[in-house]
C-alpha cells in the first residue's frame, strides 16, 4: 500500500473500433456483477466511456452542456435551476483537460470495494450525514480494509443529489467548487484499475453514490 487519497467527471472509425474492442467485453463483465444494481452498473459503464476516449466524451457529452448555463445557473433539462459556484469556468476547464487526456485502462468492478462503499451509503441513509468520515470515525481506508487488501493507490468519490448515472459522472468530472479537482483527477487517473460502487437514497439530498477506486484489490 503505497499511496492514499481521500478527497470529500486519428480517425473516428479507429477510435470507435478501439472502444468497441476494449469496452464491450468490459460491459459484459459489468453486467455479470450481480452485486451491483442497475443504477450502479450504469455508473460504471459511464465511467468507462469517459476513460475509453476522454476527448470524444468531452466533445459529445460535455460541450453541449455549455448551453445549459445562464450565468452561474445551470439547468438540467426537466429540472429546477442549480446555482453553481463557478459558472461555466469549471466546465470549460474540464473540457480542456479531457481533450488532452489519452485513453485510460477501463475499470473492472470489485465486489469487495462495492461492499466498502455500501457501508457508507447505509450509514448516511440513517444519519443524513455527508462526507468521507463515518459515524465512528471510519474513513475510506478503514472501510475498504474490512473486506480485503488494496494495492497501489486508493481513493473515494462521493456525489449527492444526482439522480441519474450520467449526472453522477458529469458532476464529478466538472468538480464545480472543488479547487483540487480531485474527483475529476481520480476518474482520469491511470493508476486506478478496479472500482466498487454503491448508490442509494439520502434523506437530505435524495440520492447519493459512493465510489471506492484502487490500483488493485484482493477480497478476504
Predicted segments, located by residue:
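Short hydrophobic/aromatic segments of transmembrane alpha-helices and their interfaces
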Residues: 5-6, 26, 166-167
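Boundary at the C-terminal end of the N-terminal hydrophobic targeting segment
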Residues: 21-25
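Bacterial N-terminal signal peptides that target proteins for export
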Residues: 1-9
